[in-house]
């Protein structure tokens, strides 16, 4: 809970993107209390990361004033964290508790010196220093450092301690950086998409950790359950303005709905006034020219008002493929392993014809391998995979290899044609692309400069135009804003076929999933009919309420 001590203020802060006239932040006035938990939300490109960099002191190119109260430490988790490539995972994580590490090293060196010959004065000095070090280590509970590091690394599913940083994937680097930052325990935590690349168990641990965190937490995230469970304040960046709300995400949604209704009423009233004034101006006789000028001035004033631009109404169009029969995909006693690691064994499930199956589990558990087995890119070690005769698969993976960075968005979809064929129908190519939130100049962007979220939407548009009736979507919500996720939810709910979706976004899964396929460790995969929340309740009843870190089952003990 915040203690009402203001530690940070923004006074009239604004920012314009370099080499353009686009204003992303304008006249923002904010104050943060110590201990506050704040979630920052907004569309992609609304200035969330820019605001975080200004708060962190990394971006000085802004208008206005930023004031920190003295004596508070700040830690920032960037989307692409920096770390020494020549270090091991453990060495990087230890940087978060470097002072304690140094104390323990010196304490060990002091103890070794007792074996060396020395006079009484040197001995007394050594004993005194040993006492000082003991007191300092006691104060920071340094004797428990090894177990503390182990718990933190396990909770965030970090790579092995001795793994080299240069071999880590982007997701692994993010988890290592988050672990290092949390161990530092700064007064203010700035977290840019902290749940990206975390499995569900790690997200739940992080939520509990941040709820109990004594300092201030400011997080940019599209994870709506995270915002509901952690945030006590929501800061919405909307058309350059910062709009604070005291409450979690659910309460923010309610007031946002009311605010949009009010905006629509005000805009409707303004338009009606404009229409009345314009009608009077057009019909006024010359004899009333003086009064007409006054009315014309009123009209022009209304016209010049900055009408509040509505948020774009996003839509992701998922065309229905050919009619899907009753038999979709069936796994019968399927097993799969890599080397001595068994991913799953005796896996049995049947995909429902009109269902949406959410696939959950830690990174590296075998979720993407499951998709590759369905696609036929890999073969099972045992068992059978049966695909129905009417099935037409459409696979949206995370690699996006089919996207040429030197082509524009429009060229990628249209392929030198003005039309896109959807089954027996032809639709205007630009209209089709616009239904995935690429409109106007965005269609002429080169694919090589697209953001992660834009590449996700483009790959979705590219794959879906083939009109599959069974969709395999691998992490479709990564790097996209909440509005785009909502549009995807609506698109999937209106899709007539079957969809299988790998995701760590619990709110998204609760909205769309009719079934859950959960990788639960030790080669076990559990198929459950119901929503994500219903599965979680079922899991707790079966396995208990305590988190259980995922373990691979070895083929040979």
Please state what every model-predicted region is.
Residues 277-286, 300, 314-321, 327-330:
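Alpha-helical coupling/stalk and coiled-coil linker elements that connect catalytic or binding modules
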Residues 255-288, 292-298, 302-309:
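Intracellular alpha-helical coupling/juxtamembrane segments of multi-pass membrane proteins
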Residues 1-268, 312, 319-557:
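ABC ATP-binding cassette signature C-motif
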